[in-house]
Every structure is written in structure tokens, then in C-alpha cells.
Amino acid sequence: MQVLHVCSEMFPLLKTGGLADVVGALPAAQIAEGGDVRVLLPAFPDVRNGIPDSVLVAEIDSFAGRVGLRYGTYHGVGIYLIDAPWLYERPGSPYHDQSMNAYSDNHRRFALLGWMACELAKGLDRYWRPQVVHAHDWHAGLACAYLAANGHPARSVFTVHNLAYQGLFSAHHVPELWLPPSFFNIYGLEFYGQMSFLKAGLFYADHITAVSPTYAREITRPEFGYGMEGLLQERQRQGRLSGILNGVDDKIWDPSHDPRLTARYDADNLKNKAKNKLHLQKAMGLKVDESLPLFAVVSRLTSQKGLDLVLEALPALLEQGGQLALLGAGDAVLQQAFLAAAADYPEQVGVQIGYHEAFSHRIIGGADVIMVPSRFEPCGLTQLYGLKYGTLPLVRRTGGLADTVVDCALENLADGSASGFVFDDCDAVALGNAIRRAMVLWSRPKHWRHVQRHAMSVDFGWQVAAQEYLSLYQRLS
């Protein structure tokens, strides 16, 4: 089965969010399961620099000018690069300029990504041709539309990593992008008078997947559907919508081999985890005391991630003797509020604004609890990292958080299935109650260790997801 993943970023070549982690791990896992899998990416500077030995496969005239298709390998995965420097050779973010303004030609930049995927399906590389094109999020959504417009030269899968990002552009770009004018209607690309790259993926794909079973159900409801719920309900009725849970890349996230940690550890040697905690407390300027429960946040600072709830619940957490270590960036108001808390409580609150991959490992390896109180969370990877590292997740019951964390309720503690702390209502009171339950369990070290060891034993590796996707591809073909 020849499969082409189409996406805008891939860890560790280029990462702005969890999408990159998924694409950085899933193709390799599918290859390990016997798939013939490659990836198509725009040749952004970091991507091009990470694959310096790529060779030119083909050149082709497109709506964006004459572009090159290059091919190389990265850690055993074949990578196609779209060589169009006038579109992709820009510093910083692949999506916006240094003033955080989206590039005015993003419609062209990411339409080309979808168009080139279709050209590969039509035989642009005469030595390799995908049977399935697997597009990820809005950036690649037009791949499904171009395949439909060209007689379906390959089957298509579209994965929703986050429905909130829809890739909306003016309708007048439709003919410029070599799309059939008939595609711009309610049964196609049109979304409230604009062209939606996300809707293109949802409408034209042979099958839609969401990144967790719960999120696949949630997005058929108005509160999570962002206006797409009607289409998604129809795809659900047709059996063309399913949820496949993301996994953890064991080569990157494994506390027994993680070079970023002060001390490596596993479920049978948790004493070394305490060394990471003491190092983290010192690095964040907190009181260095192993007995204090250390809560952590590694997240974009947005209301979607529930960080305003963390602020509301923070006084109670501190009153109960807890500490908070936060790594993240985002909303300026939230950033300032957390920095103010760190200034007011320097021994209990440590804040680092920004995102540093290595430091995220040290926080997750050193903390006792990782908080993910999201209003919605398609899958979430942070809680999976927490489970793997014995850093108990405290999460809201939504999306992939609901699918991966089992609450420390008495019955779950009794049968050994508990792996973290789960709350339902989206408010600071519910979060505060979950924090209290974490504090109570912390005061019982024997029970805490029991839950830790179970959490670390749960397998969220990519092999299961890789097999599920390969089975889906087989059904489609």
C-alpha cells in the first residue's frame, strides 16, 4: 500500500504544534508495519536545511509558477519537498510574518501543497505513485478537492487535528487556484461566502478521521463543530467519519532513555524522577523541597487550553502547599497574569514564556502533575507524555483527554485502572476540586506510586494507530 501524507510541518524538521509530532511519528510507524509511506512538505527553510541531500525529481508549471519537486529521506522516511522559494523561503513561522499577520498569499502557498499531492497521485514521480493521499488539517485540505476534480487518481483520507482552524480565504481566489468554479457552492468549498480549505478536506475526502474517538463524536455537535457539524453528521451517518487516537513517539518520549533529563528513570526506579524534580525546582527559582507537590503546565496560553481556569484556581493550589511550573506563550493578558503570580509567589510559581522542546521534557520529567484543563482538546499529547513519565495528568473530560486518562475515583483506585485526575464542568470550581483530589492522593505516597506505575505501563505507542490507519486505507482501496 503506497501512501502519501500531505502536511505543512513535521517534527523535528519544523514544529509549531502537535500536528508536527503526529506527522513526525506516524509515517515511520506505518513503515514499520509494512506500509510504503512517504510525506509531502513545502520546502520551508528549516525543512530544506534538514534534508540537504534532496534531489530534483520533476519540474512542473502550476498556478503559482514553475515549481520543482525534490525527494530525500529523513530517518528512513521518504520526503518530497515542494521547491518554490518565492512562496516558502521566509524566516520564522511558516504561516505568518513577524508581526503575527498571516501571509497574504497563504491561499496560494497551501493550495500548491494540495495541488502537488494530486499531481503525485497522477504520476508526477514516474517511479512512485500513491494509492492513498492522507491530508492533515486545513493546510492540506485542497488535496482532496484536486483529487476529486481530476477523477480521483487516488483515494483520500483527511485528518482533523483541530477543527477551529479552517483556512478561510476570499472566493475570488477559486479560479486562480485552478479549481472548477462548480466546486464553490454549499456542496463543496463554500463556507458563508468564503472558500474553506478545511471544508474542502471534509467534503471531498473519501474518509475523515479525527485524532480521538471522543473528538470524532464531539465535532458532530454545534458546540464543537464550528459550523461544520451538519456535514460531519452526514459523514457519520455514511460511515465516513471515525476517530483514531494519536500515539507517543517512544524514540522521543521515554524517561528511561531521554537525554534531556537530569536523571533517567522508569517505573521500577522512581527515585531518579525525584532528582529531576529537584533540578526543575532550582531551575524555575522555586523552593527546593521534594515533599511539595509540583504541578506543571506546558501549553499555549489560550482560553481554549483552559489557562484562565488555572489562574482562577491558582490561589487555592498555593494555599494547599502546591507549586506551579509553567512553560508556554500566547495570550498577552494570560502571560502577564502568570508572570505577576510568579513575582508575588517566587518560591511557589515559576514561569517561562516561550516554548523550548528540551525544557518541556525537563518539566514533564520533573513535575508530579501535568495540567491540561482544556475547553476542547482534539487529542492532546501532553497528557500522554505525562502518563509515560509518571507525571499524573489532571485533565478535563473532553476529546482525547477523555479517552486517555482514568480518574482516581475510589472504584478506579480499587481495580487499578486510575491514571490521573479528571473533571467535567468547565469552571475553576471543578478544576479546584480535581486539584484537591490530587493533593489528597499526594498525601498517600503508597497509593500515588501505585497510580504512577500503572500510568507508566499504559501503552499509547504509535503501532496501534499505524495499524488502524493501514486497515482504513485497505478498506478504501
UniProtKB/Swiss-Prot annotation:
Annotated GO MF terms: alpha-1,4-glucan glucosyltransferase (ADP-glucose donor) activity; alpha-1,4-glucan glucosyltransferase (UDP-glucose donor) activity
GO CC annotations on file: cytosol
EC number: 2.4.1.21
Organism of derivation: Serratia proteamaculans (strain 568)
Reaction it catalyzes: [(1->4)-alpha-D-glucosyl](n) + ADP-alpha-D-glucose = [(1->4)-alpha-D-glucosyl](n+1) + ADP + H(+)
Enzyme category, top tier: transferase
Described function: Synthesizes alpha-1,4-glucan chains using ADP-glucose.
Keyword Lipoprotein assigned: no
Similarity annotation: Belongs to the glycosyltransferase 1 family. Bacterial/plant glycogen synthase subfamily.
Amino-acid positions noted as binding ADP-alpha-D-glucose in the UniProt annotation, renumbered to this chain: 15
UniProt record, GO biological process: glycogen biosynthetic process
Protein name, as recorded: Glycogen synthase
